[in-house]
């Protein structure tokens, strides 16, 4: 009994109209062998596979088992060799204990005031609820058929307006630069203070 056998179907003869058309620089092709699986011709084209479930007219089909080289150029083997690795459980146990003690020491070092803990939990839960509500609103607005397209048109219109207002001419670019610097001073404060 063989462990690794392979059953392949080989086309040994194609119709005479296919042979000798001069596709291979004038040399006639007498015999073409294609590996098939259960009378289904398969040709691999980059990312797609073409399959033909019917037999070619005038073909002769033979079935044979093979234990030699398969269609990928890899030799089939009769047995499987598995190498078992021995793990040294004694050296892994202290490492796991060290990691656990480091994690516990880190958690013991964290000290939270009760006043700050409540405010942090309140802000965190409020942020999670706000994120959930925002995603629900956005998904409901996307369900309206015309709304996303309308928002795209509004965005393109604003982009065109901003470009013509501030970026097209030099005096307008300088005006934008002064407005940005004023806003920076308001937010960050002036350097002289």
From Swiss-Prot:
Coiled coil: none annotated. It holds the Pfam family CAAD. Residues 139-142 are lumenal. The chain crosses the membrane at residues 118-138, 143-163. It is a multi-pass membrane protein. Residues 1-51 form a transit peptide. It is found in: Plastid, Chloroplast thylakoid membrane. GO terms for cellular component: chloroplast thylakoid membrane. The keyword rRNA-binding does not apply. Keywords: Chloroplast, Membrane, Plastid, Thylakoid, Transit peptide, Transmembrane, Transmembrane helix. Disruption phenotype: No effect on growth behavior, leaf coloration, grana stacks or photochemical efficiency of photosystem II. Curt1a, curt1b, curt1c and curt1d quadruple mutant shows disorganized thylakoids with extended stretches of unstacked membranes and broader stacks made up of fewer layers. Determines thylakoid architecture by inducing membrane curvature. Homo- and heterodimers and trimers. This is Protein CURVATURE THYLAKOID 1D, chloroplastic. It comes from Arabidopsis thaliana.
């Amino acid at each position: 009994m063989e462990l690794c056998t392979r059953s392949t179907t080989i086309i040994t003869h194609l119709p005479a109209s296919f042979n000798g058309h001069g596709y291979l620089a004038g040399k006639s092709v007498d015999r073409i062998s294609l590996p098939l699986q259960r009378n289904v011709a398969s040709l691999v084209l980059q990312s797609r596979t073409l399959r033909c479930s019917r037999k070619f007219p005038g073909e002769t089909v033979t079935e044979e088992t093979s234990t030699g080289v398969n269609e990928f150029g890899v030799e089939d083997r009769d047995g499987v060799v598995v190498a078992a690795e021995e793990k040294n459980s004694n050296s892994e146990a202290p490492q796991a204990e060290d990691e656990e003690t480091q994690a516990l020491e880190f958690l013991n070092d964290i000290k939270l005031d009760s006043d700050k803990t409540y405010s942090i939990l309140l802000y965190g839960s409020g942020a999670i609820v706000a994120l959930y509500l925002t995603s629900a609103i956005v998904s409901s607005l996307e369900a309206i058929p015309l709304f996303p397209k309308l928002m795209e048109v509004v965005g393109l219109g604003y982009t065109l307006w901003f470009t013509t207002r501030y970026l097209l001419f030099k005096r307008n670019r300088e005006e934008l630069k002064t407005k940005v610097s004023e806003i920076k001073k308001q937010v960050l404060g002036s350097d002289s203070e």
